[in-house]
Regions:
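Non-catalytic cell-wall polysaccharide-engagement segments
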Residues: 2-11, 24-27, 31, 38-40, ...
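Hydrophobic alpha-helical membrane-insertion segments, chiefly the h-region
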Residues: 12-21
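Extracytoplasmic
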Residues: 28, 42-47, 52, 65-68, ...
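Generic hydrophobic alpha-helical membrane-segment signal
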Residues: 41-42, 57-60, 121
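Cell-wall polysaccharide-cleaving catalytic domain and substrate-binding groove, primarily
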Residues: 52-77, 133
């Protein structure tokens, strides 16, 4: 009986430590996220959910396709940001700076939300663009406009069913 109690206490302690560690990890960038989200007029919670999905709040992470940082910024997105905002040139390693990374990510997300503001589900199509790029997202939007959700169907679920990239479909579904 004593061993069972000790094991139970160890499990409880491990759960408390893991929870506090995850809480700390997920809140330590809230100030940066809040500033950038407000500056670009995007929802704070949407940005946090995107960061969780992209990097699990790990600022130094690098993706297989060369994307980096909390919001997994690509060089192409960073180049577009510098060109369209007049931001001075940057060195690729600067994209690992959480403040710059979140700034560019929020700018890109806002650009996507603006681009798809007239779509049937702007947040969904913005996330699809963020993950898969412009061309596939335009194709999915065309399909969505050609086949509206059936009566009684959840629009988000219907539009996600049109996405033929399984990872992108899961990505957007998890964020929303």
């Amino acid at each position: 009986m004593r061993r069972i109690l000790i094991a139970a206490w160890i499990c409880i302690l491990a759960a408390v430590v893991a929870s506090s560690w995850m809480y700390r990890r997920s809140t330590r960038f809230d100030f940066i996220i809040g500033q950038a989200a407000a500056r670009h007029g995007v929802d704070f919670h949407l940005v946090k959910a995107l960061i969780y999905e992209e990097s699990w709040f790990r600022p130094g992470i690098r993706g297989a396709a060369g994307e980096v940082g909390l919001m997994q910024i690509t060089r192409a997105a960073a180049a577009d940001y510098t060109k369209r905002t007049g931001f001075p040139g940057y060195r690729p390693e600067q994209l690992l700076d959480p403040a710059l990374n979140v700034e560019i990510g929020c700018w890109y997300l806002k650009d996507s939300l603006t681009r798809y503001r007239d779509s049937p589900h702007p947040e969904l199509f913005a996330l699809l663009r963020y993950n898969a790029g412009e061309t596939p997202t335009r194709n999915w939007l065309r399909l969505a406009l050609e086949s509206p959700p059936p009566a009684g169907a959840e629009p988000e679920t219907h539009f996600l069913s049109l996405v033929d990239y399984p990872k992108t479909r899961t990505y957007a579904g998890r964020i929303l």
